Amino acid sequence: MMTDPIADMLTRIRNAALARHDRTEVPASRIKAAVAEILKSEGFIADVRETEGEGPKKLTIVLKYGRDRQSAIDGVRRVSRPGRRVYVRHDRIPRVFSGLGISILSTSRGLMSDRDARRLKMGGELICEVW
């Protein structure tokens, strides 16, 4: 049984990017779809689609590469996890690589990037960092 599905999704994305795969599939859930949509809107992945087939629904995440197949994602880190939740106020949201990366937060208004949370002055649970 998987205890942290978000960490599993982030690990699959990281491993696929390091192996230079075009896409990866993860079991679908609303929170994973929301994280993937934020990664897409911030320019870290090219596309995300929910696919149905035999068995449970899956999210197909299409990775984004630049020149020389350089991945848009250099690193991913799960911050808050089931055994250690991490909460931050809006004025304490960390800047990832001086603003080159993003943090994803779970707030009372749903999942959002660190930039949106700072703009709306909302704190919450710090889900992960991507750079």
Swiss-Prot record:
Q: List, in alphabetical order, the GO biological process terms annotated in this UniProt record.
A: translation
| Alphabetical list of InterPro entries matching this protein | Ribosomal_uS8, Ribosomal_uS8_CS, Ribosomal_uS8_sf
What is this protein's function?
Answer: One of the primary rRNA binding proteins, it binds directly to 16S rRNA central domain where it helps coordinate assembly of the platform of the 30S subunit.
Quaternary assembly:
Part of the 30S ribosomal subunit. Contacts proteins S5 and S12.
Q: Which GO terms describe its molecular function?
A: rRNA binding; structural constituent of ribosome
A GO cellular component annotation here is: ribonucleoprotein complex
Q: Which UniProt keywords apply?
A: Ribonucleoprotein, Ribosomal protein, RNA-binding, rRNA-binding
Q: Which PROSITE patterns match?
A: RIBOSOMAL_S8
Please name the source species.
Answer: Sorangium cellulosum (strain So ce56) (Polyangium cellulosum (strain So ce56))
Q: Which NCBIfam families match?
A: PRK00136.1
Specify the protein name: Small ribosomal subunit protein uS8
Family (UniProt): Belongs to the universal ribosomal protein uS8 family.
